[in-house]
Amino acid sequence: MRERQRGLDSNAAKIIRDRLRQHYHLQTDWSHLGFDRYREGIAVLSRYDFLMTDAGYVSSSQDVHSIDSRKVVMVQLHVPYMGAVNVFSAHLSWLSGGFFEQFDRLRAWANHKHGDHLAATFLCGDFNIKAGSEGYQAVVRSREYEDQYLAATSPSAFEKIFRQQSPNIDCHLAKDGRIDFIFMQKHSSLQAVAARELFTNGHYGRVSDHIGYCVEFEPNW
């Protein structure tokens, strides 16, 4: 999400929220300045009240003039018929910019917040790692967070990668160009039942150089 330095009125997430016909709650923060004028950050829009919010840097750099400075926002909310969930909205660096340390800090933070009182913990956003790449394989090796779009759209590949720990992850995902993901803590009590792409030429139209991903969940109690 971007906003000009003058403040929240120019924040892209707020502009989107203000145009929606229903009321949505917004949590947003920014990581660094892009092109020396835009506050580049992250956001969460929710139909449900926030029970808790937090934000913090997961990068070593906290210099607002450095593109390697990366902050994450976190919200906890109660979803009817499912329970409380934690959502972390992230935009991490490329491998060369510190992805590994940023992801390690993010998952440690998320794991610290996770507990039996939660139905799920989600790590969502632009991770700047291609599906099947070295960075993606690091997520798989953590054995903590799993790709929910893949679980819903390709159960066979999901099973081989996340359950059987296949050594050929890059082969299973050779045609998968995603760098944006919805990872769920594997001990969560929800399951992905459907998924689709958004913000394509056929679904709502393009809004950026990224595609959106929508995943539907049900309890698996």
Regions found by a protein language model. Name each.
Residues 1-86, 194-197:
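Structured beta-strand-rich core segments of catalytic domains in phosphoester-bond hydrolases
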Residues 7-8, 38-41, 100-101, 134-137, ...:
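Short aromatic-enriched loop/helix-cap "lid" or pocket-rim segments at secondary-structure transitions
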Residues 8-12, 67-70, 98-105, 131, ...:
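Soluble or luminal CAZymes and related metallo-dependent hydrolases
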Residues 2-5, 34-37, 95-98, 128-134, ...:
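Active-site environment of divalent metal-dependent phosphoester hydrolases
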Residues 71-88, 98-137:
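His/acidic metal-ligating clusters that form di-metal
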